[in-house]
């Protein structure tokens, strides 16, 4: 079943700080996109008002069900705006994450990145995600009491690789997200 997730919390270090309106889409067959636009961009952020945007196919993520509502996902993003824009001190390569379902219906993601290089100290992060109903136009919370959710929403994926761009478009129910990166 496809999924649409709204990020509620982002935390690096001891203090949470959510400055974006982040939505992530996952297709039925495991392709994914995460768009993270700033709510109030300022300064240099105005030229590219996204904290980050990335996408990948089901070939760029390894998923393992650990049982009891815990899943590990190891991502190696196919498209990554931090790489494309050559943003300093950002992670390159596989990101190992653990996802845990909460009784509230939210999903906690934890992991670590290596923004200063794989041989340097890691930086731990935590994100809290709220599933939303992709068949609705509004952001409608899914499964607040952790009951089984079913939807008639379908997913469509378009992957673009041509001489000018690499890109991925995912349609989840009534929602669409896309990332396109020009080739150099």
UniProtKB/Swiss-Prot annotation:
Q: Which Gene3D superfamilies match?
A: Protein HRI1, C-terminal domain, Protein HRI1, N-terminal domain
Q: PTM Phosphoserine: list the residues.
A: 143
- Subunit description: Interacts with HRR25. May interact with SEC72.
Recorded GO cellular component terms are: cytoplasm; nucleus
Q: Which UniProt keywords apply?
A: Cytoplasm, Nucleus, Phosphoprotein
Q: Which organism is it from?
A: Saccharomyces cerevisiae (strain AWRI796) (Baker's yeast)
Task: Kindly provide the name given to this protein in its UniProt entry.
Answer: Protein HRI1
Q: Which family does it belong to?
A: Belongs to the HRI1 family.
Report the locations given in the UniProt record: Cytoplasm; Nucleus
Which superkingdom? Eukaryota
